[in-house]
């Protein structure tokens, strides 16, 4: 019998009014192959990455006191947990690719749904992927001299993209292995921090000289010249700090939110999770609780070893700058020079794990937007194994472009503001979903409703206001990005019709 080459339109549903469908054109060949452990690993693998090994060193000199630093991490965790409880309810109701995008599109309309999806795509994934790849390249360059950091980042992105484009199951297995490795490294650092005795911390001579010469009013500049190590350590730990709940603290929390990015990633692959009504909420909420606890423990180790005011180093221009490798510095003091190099190598593996998860989930966001008509139809193509090949190729190409055209510091400054705005849109949508469809089945119901979304929205607004008060440039850049997204929408979107779908099965097999 000759093969039937007719379009396989029965594989799709285009039912904008169907609450079970969420109004999206979803290909049924997406397979539910991700188990609860892998779903939890996706979130944990996304969250434990570059943030915990960099952010504390960036905010330490700004906040000065250990209490302020711990409060910043706690409040960022509260925001993440409130968002996780809310999103868990939504993702259990709408278990398909990119549940955040689907619910915002459904509740707030296609325009804000598009903005939410583009923020998640461009900022939460593409920009963060490029940043993590660049950091990984820098760490590799510390271990292997005379290598090009950006070339390393490019090779890493291409390799992980190839794995996840080839197979869905292989990608989750790779992530599972890397999550175990990274968790072991973090636990090892935490255990060493509470069991190894260290000497009082004394900044290097170059740091103290730079402080006295270029920043005479700083805490480091007032360190007594002939003081003992214990006296210097005590001087740094008792320095004056900003008041609690100040704009300075709020702006620092914006930076800390970068370390919590990834708690929502199980919702982005909900269409491929087995028993999503049970497993997706476990993954989302469980990852925030587990990773948040680890973050607090690791920060206690950092603060035990290095006073916040001393978390600085001399930059290429001879001026003091926030410490960029707090994890490596602490590991070297706890484990010695050899241990420091081993931890540097382990951090490269951790960053690879973060990138692995981001590549997996970002492709689903692109595909979901294509099925909605918010991106060209070709971006929604799946291969025979159900992986969004075209979307993965597009995200890898975009991230590599970012790696080669911008610097790391300028890339990260405004990420927190835009991601906070995207979370606020999701929280508003979840509240509207409760109001408009109170009788819809909810496999998971968030506790203490409406407190979780209100906490997330309220604290999110405070963070944006604090960031603007401290430095208006990141907020202005975020506003410009939003304007550009809205302006570009007519060029990227298309009317979604049955005829637009075509022979998706044949197209995906050719990809």
Residue ranges and their predicted role:
Residues 197, 227, 234, 413-414, ...:
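A generic transmembrane alpha-helix motif of multi-pass inner-membrane proteins
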Residues 137, 150-212, 261, 284-288, ...:
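Membrane-interface loop-to-helix entry segments
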Residues 181-234, 301-306, 428-440:
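Hydrophobic alpha-helical segments and their helix-loop junctions in multi-pass secondary transporters
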Residues 1-57, 61-66, 81, 85, ...:
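Membrane-interface "cap" regions at the ends of multi-pass membrane proteins
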Residues 4-5, 10-18, 101-111, 133-153, ...:
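Helix-loop-helix connectors at the membrane interface of multi-pass transporters/channels
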Residues 58-61, 71, 81-165, 170, ...:
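Hydrophobic transmembrane alpha-helices that form the core helical bundles
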Residues 102-104, 109, 142, 214-242, ...:
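TM-loop-TM module centered on a large, flexible mid-protein loop between adjacent transmembrane helices
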Residues 160, 174-177, 378-389, 423-472, ...:
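C-terminal membrane-solvent junction of multi-pass transporters and transport-like membrane proteins
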């Amino acid at each position: 019998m000759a093969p039937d080459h007719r379009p396989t339109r029965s594989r799709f549903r285009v039912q904008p009014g169907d609450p079970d469908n969420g109004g999206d054109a979803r290909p049924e060949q997406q397979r539910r192959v991700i188990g609860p452990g892998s779903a939890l690993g996706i979130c944990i693998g996304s969250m434990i990455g570059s943030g915990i090994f960099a952010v504390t060193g960036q905010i330490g000199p700004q906040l000065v006191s250990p209490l302020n630093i711990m409060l910043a991490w706690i409040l960022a965790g509260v925001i993440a947990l409130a968002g996780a409880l809310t999103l868990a309810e939504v993702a259990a109701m709408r278990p398909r690719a990119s549940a955040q995008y689907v619910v915002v599109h459904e509740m707030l309309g296609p325009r804000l749904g598009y903005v939410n999806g583009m923020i998640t795509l461009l900022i939460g994934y593409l920009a963060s992927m490029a940043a993590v790849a660049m950091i990984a390249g820098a760490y590799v360059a510390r271990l292997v001299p005379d290598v090009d950091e950006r070339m390393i980042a490019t090779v890493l992105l291409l390799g992980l993209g190839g794995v996840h484009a080839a197979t869905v199951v292989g990608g989750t297995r790779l992530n599972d292995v890397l999550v175990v490795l990274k968790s072991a490294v973090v636990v090892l650092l935490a255990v060493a921090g509470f069991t190894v005795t260290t000497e009082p911390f004394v900044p290097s001579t170059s740091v103290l000289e730079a402080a006295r010469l270029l920043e005479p009013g700083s805490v480091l500049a007032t360190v007594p010249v002939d003081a003992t190590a214990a006296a210097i350590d005590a001087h740094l730990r008792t320095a004056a700090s900003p008041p609690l709940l100040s704009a300075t603290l709020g702006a620092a929390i914006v930076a800390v939110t970068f370390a919590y990015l990834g708690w929502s990633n199980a919702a982005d692959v909900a269409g491929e999770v087995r028993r999503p009504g049970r497993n997706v909420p476990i993954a989302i909420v469980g990852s925030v609780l587990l990773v948040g606890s680890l973050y607090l423990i690791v920060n206690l180790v950092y603060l035990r070893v290095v006073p916040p005011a001393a978390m600085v180093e001399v930059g290429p221009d001879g001026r003091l700058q926030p410490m960029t490798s707090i994890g490596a510095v602490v590991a070297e003091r706890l484990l010695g020079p050899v241990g420091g190099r081993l931890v540097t190598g382990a951090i490269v593996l951790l960053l690879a794990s973060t990138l692995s998860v981001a590549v997996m989930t970002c492709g689903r966001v692109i595909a979901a937007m294509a099925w909605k008509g918010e991106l060209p139809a070709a971006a929604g193509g799946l291969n025979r194994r159900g992986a969004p090949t075209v979307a993965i190729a597009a995200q890898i190409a975009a991230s590599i472009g970012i790696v080669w055209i911008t610097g790391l510091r300028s890339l990260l400054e405004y990420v927190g503001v835009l991601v906070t705005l995207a979370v606020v849109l999701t929280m508003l949508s979840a509240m509207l979903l409760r109001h408009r469809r109170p009788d819809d089945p909810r496999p998971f119901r968030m506790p203490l409703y409406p407190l979780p979304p209100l906490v997330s929205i309220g604290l999110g607004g405070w963070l944006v206001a604090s960031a603007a008060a401290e430095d208006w440039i990141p907020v202005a850049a975020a506003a410009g990005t939003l304007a550009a997204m809205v302006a570009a929408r007519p060029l990227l979107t298309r009317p979604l019709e049955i005829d637009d779908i075509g022979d998706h099965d044949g197209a995906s097999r050719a990809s």
